[in-house]
C-alpha cells in the first residue's frame, strides 16, 4: 500500500507551518505501508495542480492532506469538503476568491473516503486530543480536500482521500495568549497513528458518535 501525505507551506504571516514540519518527519514506512510526503503551496488551484502531478507520479492508494487550523485544540480529521472558495485572507499569491465554486462539474460537497472515526480513536489512544470536524473552512485547506476528492470522483476511482487539520505548534503561540498549541513530536505521532488506522481500516470505519448538536 502507498500513502501520499501533503503539507502546506507557511501562510497568513506565519514563518512556519506545522503541517509541513510534521510531514517532513514521518517515517518512510508506517504499518507496512510506503509513505511519501510532498509540500503543497498555499495557493488556490496551484495546490491541486501540484497534488495531481504527484498522484500521477506516485500512484498512491490513499492521500492524506494535512493543514494548520490555528486555535483548534486537537487533531481533527475532516468529514466533508464543500464546493466553495470564500477566502477571509489572500493566499500566498494574493488570490482571494469570494463565493466561488471550485469545480463547476463537481458535486456540491464530497465526503472523506478515509476512516475518520478510526483515525480519531487511534489518536486518542495515544493520549492526544482528537475529534471529527464537520467543516474544513473555505480557504485553501477545504479547496485542496475538495480537489483531492474531485480527482477520486473523476480520475482515480480506486484511490481514497481525505484531510486532517492540526493545531499550531507551541512556538507559534508564544505571543498568542489563550491559544492552543501542540508539540511537533505529538503532532507527528498523531499523524502516524492516523495513517496506521488508514492502513488497518481500508474501506470501512468505526461506527462511533462523531456528530455535533450545532
From Swiss-Prot:
Q: What is its EC number?
A: 3.4.19.3
Keyword list (alphabetical) reads: Cytoplasm, Hydrolase, Protease, Thiol protease
Q: Which Pfam families match?
A: Peptidase_C15
Question: Which PANTHER family does the record cross-reference, listed alphabetically?
Answer: PROTEASE FAMILY C15 PYROGLUTAMYL-PEPTIDASE I-RELATED, PYROGLUTAMYL-PEPTIDASE I
On subunit structure and binding partners, the annotation says:
Homotetramer.
Role noted for this protein: Removes 5-oxoproline from various penultimate amino acid residues except L-proline.
Q: What is this protein called?
A: Pyrrolidone-carboxylate peptidase 1
